[in-house]
Amino acid sequence: MEEIQRYLQLERSQQHDFLYPLIFQEYIYAFAHDRGFSRSILSENPGYDNKSSLLIVKRLITRMYQQNHFLISPNDSNQNRFLARNKNLYFQIISEGFAFIVEIPFSLRLISCLEGKKRVKSQNLRSIHSIFPFLEDNFSHFNFVLDIGIPHPIHVEILVQILRYWVKDASSLHLLRFFLNEYCNWNSLITPKKGSSSFSKRNQRLFLFLYNSHVCEYESIFVFLRNQSSHLRSTSSGVLLERIYFYEKIERLVNVFVKVKDFQANLWFVKEPCMHYIRYQRKSILASKGTSLFMNKWKCYLVTFWQWHFXLWFHPRRIYINQLSNHSLEFLGYLSNVRMNPSVVRSQVLENSFLINNAIKKFDTLVPIIPLIASLAKAKFCNVLGHPISKPVRADLSDSNIIDRFGRICRNLSHYHSGSSKKKSLYRIKYILRLSCARTLARKHKSTVRAFLKRLGSELLEEFLMSEEDVLFLTFPKASSALWGVYRSRIWYLDIICINDLANHKSKF
């Protein structure tokens, strides 16, 4: 009991983060403008000098505390349009500025922790691919996974309350609460639709910060459980999940864990050294080498704990228990599973020989071909059946520019899916992009694909649509036999920080 109370002890820091005065500093909004502002928004407001003025911010805060300040009169349509445009502009200014301000104490803590532990290359951990080497080393030993869909908080007030444990500045939190309740449509943030508000489209920074704080809140329990159950005590996760606990939660945790005679004897159901937790965006995975009964206990425990102590409504049907040998796990654009790779070893002792069948577990990462084709169809590169089609392009685009844009998409896909175990599935994607590019150029020149390729030459397309593996073979032709092993193996890169959304490319043509 004493160990739990020490772990959950409220940190009595003498330093207070007073962020409210920063809201009225113009240089803060200049930084926010450089980092996240879109100048297209500013151009929609005539008479604005592309500068986040202190007077505008003060005027915004004053209007926020006034009642009915955006009542629209049906008799003045011009004024209505002006108020709507300025409301979106004020929306943009205060959200970007507040997101920049509230990140300051967290950035300072993280920088000080990283400098203290001399982690020079911590930026490599931002890469999406950095998680897959961990999966390769550990998932082959696991049997079951809990596939968890993380729910959103049921009310904006929960996000403000969570942030209150980090930032002890009542004025800033009160302004944030008023801002969210007054302007934000939380449903449009969770499920953005066509024609949604400007905030849901362009102000993702503040929402992502609040959502990550919300997720970090309930993930803090894993640090405690890991320190209690694992032989290797956690030394790095505490930096990322460091938080300030309050006394009411301490009492509730004591009721959960310590209302027993012998705490260590009743922690057996979570005492699993090989339990691993992974999260990305709205999905998390809990993997273990335990049995199905063990995973069911974890499922019941997590659902009950999160619902009662973190105000999260986890529907039990949103948590799936899958066996890795029978199910593929959709995670970060890959289909991952653990399959048995049979191998036959011949052993000979004197005149007798034996054939020994060994089944070795192997972690596979495959390219989800059907979702990729669906993304290509959504971006108008092909139809729903995967047949390439031509894309409408502007007449002022040159042939080399069109080829370069198609080639960039192809290279990005090859770069991201370089960790696939079977790269032959990427050939169909490359074929769709290559033929779609040829049909687009033929449509521009009002010719057929065959006549266009015969006149221009297919080598030109192959030059622009060359994958990274092809570049290796052409650069080092004498080492082709050695590079063939590299081509067949998985390659993980440490410069990938987002998943390519093919739907975003359709606006570039």
From Swiss-Prot:
GO biological process: mRNA processing; RNA splicing; tRNA processing
GO cellular-component term (any): chloroplast
Pfam families linked to this entry: Intron_maturas2, MatK_N
Molecular function terms, GO-annotated: RNA binding
Signal peptide range in chain numbering: none
Record key words, sorted: Chloroplast, mRNA processing, Plastid, RNA-binding, tRNA processing
Keyword DNA repair appears in the UniProt entry: no
Subcellular localization: Plastid, Chloroplast
InterPro entries: Domain_X, Maturase_MatK, Maturase_MatK_N
Predominant cellular place of this UniProt entry's protein: plastid
Role description: Usually encoded in the trnK tRNA gene intron. Probably assists in splicing its own and other chloroplast group II introns.
Protein family according to the UniProt entry: Belongs to the intron maturase 2 family. MatK subfamily.
Name of the protein in question: Maturase K
Organism: Kigelia africana
Lineage, opening ranks: Eukaryota, Viridiplantae, Streptophyta, Embryophyta, Tracheophyta
Gene coding for it: matK
